[in-house]
Swiss-Prot record:
Subunit annotation: Heterohexadecamer of 8 large chains and 8 small chains; disulfide-linked. The disulfide link is formed within the large subunit homodimers.
Modified residues (N6,N6,N6-trimethyllysine): K14
Gene Ontology cellular-component annotations: chloroplast
Function of the protein: RuBisCO catalyzes two reactions: the carboxylation of D-ribulose 1,5-bisphosphate, the primary event in carbon dioxide fixation, as well as the oxidative fragmentation of the pentose substrate in the photorespiration process. Both reactions occur simultaneously and in competition at the same active site.
Organism: Nicotiana otophora (Tobacco)
Reaction catalysed by this enzyme: 2 (2R)-3-phosphoglycerate + 2 H(+) = D-ribulose 1,5-bisphosphate + CO2 + H2O; D-ribulose 1,5-bisphosphate + O2 = 2-phosphoglycolate + (2R)-3-phosphoglycerate + 2 H(+)
Cofactor(s) needed: Mg(2+)
Subcellular location: Plastid, Chloroplast
Entry protein name: Ribulose bisphosphate carboxylase large chain
Cofactor note: Binds 1 Mg(2+) ion per subunit.
The keyword Membrane appears for this protein: no
Swiss-Prot/TrEMBL keywords: Acetylation, Calvin cycle, Carbon dioxide fixation, Chloroplast, Disulfide bond, Lyase, Magnesium, Metal-binding, Methylation, Monooxygenase, Oxidoreductase, Photorespiration, Photosynthesis, Plastid
Keyword Plastid: yes
Other known facts: The basic functional RuBisCO is composed of a large chain homodimer in a 'head-to-tail' conformation. In form I RuBisCO this homodimer is arranged in a barrel-like tetramer with the small subunits forming a tetrameric 'cap' on each end of the 'barrel'.
Length: 477
């Protein structure tokens, strides 16, 4: 090796390990409109300064590795590296910090939620220097949003397809979720739709099991919804779950649903994966199918306050990947969901522009630049007594889904559907007349019971059923 080469090497590269904060902690950095911004809740190991922890997150989720490497000199780290540009201590929590990280847009493949998550939440969550790490929020810049198709159709197109306006939509998950034959399953679908519901639904784990193969279920459900449509004069739908073991099989099931002429299919977007979900969303737009997405497995990822990914991030990812509906919790039912947090990500699903609002857990202003909106689905442990609260909390652009709250009616499935439809109509009418659903809800339901024995029977069964448990994931004080 010549002396000149040795001299250049000694100047251009110095082997060894150096602190992340020397390269990746840049409090002077001014974020760009094209940056993807992330807010991480960081819990460092004892003895690790917060600046080093935040810089480590920025490094390990972008260009960094544990040691200096020769090939750093072959690219521009200043152009491609993530930067931890701000750190806040979490009030009321010991050794917890919010680290803000900016990522250059060139780090991400266009139109790929899969690639975005692989970078931002890939290896870094197993990093030993951190006791815990949670991704609280993302700011997706308009330049990146515009590379996604998003929901196949969106809220307004769905309403136009269904010809239903001015109220929430009503649904029901068929129970028991497993074990019914296809014919008995179709019977339950017919009874619920005939009783007044807009939708019925496959449960998330109904795919193609020995007791009910997918093709048989699709056929009996299509027969049921067409019969109910003929008798009621309303457009009906059943969420036919197309989730399968391979993308090819999933698309095959969606093709069969399209051939049957049904309006909507379903996908478990977290267990199925973002690549599969985006593929199905593209198929649904091209072929006029609505897409209902279920968030099965979400609580494994989002429920713990100090580690994982907050659901508001998963909701944003779903809007980008594509889905016309997404389960969002109920606030009042059996599943986790604090009111302000829930309404925060509901707005992120539906609205075109959402301002930063830390009181609702929204860390960044989000501009969706006309990406279609997603209907939030309130489902899980709800019944007729919850109808006023659900109508007040979620408003018209939502789906209120009663499984046990329909099929558990003492008189059967159809009366259960009648009870829910009448409770909803009573709440919408009362709201339109200027009544306060939050204060007068129970009285509104009692008044409606005078005109509906089905509703009165439902109210009697569920009058004392409540789920009074404190939420695990709550806002910081």
């Amino acid at each position: 090796m010549s002396p000149q080469t040795e001299t250049k090497a000694s100047v251009g590269f110095k082997a060894g390990v150096k602190e992340y904060k020397l390269t990746y902690y840049t409090p002077e950095y001014q974020t760009k409109d094209t940056d993807i911004l992330a807010a991480f809740r960081v819990t460092p190991q004892p003895g690790v300064p917060p600046e080093e922890a935040g810089a480590a997150v920025a490094a390990e989720s972008s260009t960094g590795t544990w040691t200096t490497v020769w090939t750093d000199g072959l690219t521009s780290l200043d152009r491609y590296k993530g930067r931890c540009y701000r750190i806040e201590r979490v009030v009321g929590e010991k050794d917890q910090y919010i680290a803000y990280v900016a990522y250059p847009l060139d780090l991400f493949e266009e139109g790929s939620v899969t690639n975005m998550f692989t970078s931002i939440v890939g290896n870094v969550f197993g990093f030993k220097a951190l006791r815990a790490l949670r991704l609280e929020d993302l700011r997706i810049p308009p330049a990146y949003v515009k590379t996604f198709q998003g929901p196949p159709h969106g809220i307004q197109v769905e309403r136009d397809k269904l010809n239903k306006y001015g109220r929430p939509l009503l649904g029901c998950t068929i129970k028991p979720k497993l074990g019914l034959s296809a014919k008995n399953y179709g019977r339950a679908v017919y009874e619920c739709l005939r009783g007044g519901l807009d939708f019925t639904k496959d449960d998330e784990n109904v795919n193609s099991q020995p007791f009910m193969r997918w093709r048989d279920r699709f056929l009996f459900c299509a027969e049921a919804l067409y019969k109910a449509q003929t008798e009621t004069g309303e457009i009906k739908g059943h969420y036919l779950n197309a989730t399968a073991g391979t993308c090819e099989e999933m698309i095959k099931r969606a093709v069969f649903a399209r051939e049957l002429g049904v309006p909507i299919v379903m996908h478990d977007y977290l267990t199925g994966g973002f690549t599969a979900n985006t593929s199905l969303a593209h198929y649904c737009r091209d072929n006029g199918l609505l897409l209902h997405t279920h968030r099965a497995m979400h609580a494994v990822i989002d429920r713990q306050k100090n580690h994982g990914i907050h659901f508001r991030v998963l909701a944003k990812a779903l809007r980008m990947s594509g889905g016309d509906h997404i389960h969002s919790g109920t606030v009042v039912g059996k599943l986790e969901g604090e009111r302000d947090i829930t309404l925060g990500f509901v707005d992120l699903l539906r609205d075109d522009f959402v301002e930063q609002d830390r009181s609702r857990g929204i860390y960044f202003t989000q501009d969706w630049v006309s990406l279609p909106g997603v209907l939030p689905v309130a489902s899980g442990g709800i019944h007729v007594w919850h109808m006023p609260a659900l109508t007040e909390i979620f408003g018209d652009d939502s789906v209120l889904q009663f499984g046990g709250g329909t099929l558990g009616h003492p008189w059967g499935n159809a009366p259960g559907a009648v009870a829910n439809r009448l409770a909803l109509e009573a709440c919408v009418q009362a709201r339109n007349e200027g009544r306060d659903l939050a204060q007068e809800g129970n009285e509104i339901i009692r008044e409606a019971c005078k005109w509906s024995p089905e509703l009165a029977a439902a109210c009697q069964v569920w009058k004392e059923i409540v789920f009074n448990f404190a939420a695990v994931d709550v806002l910081d004080k």
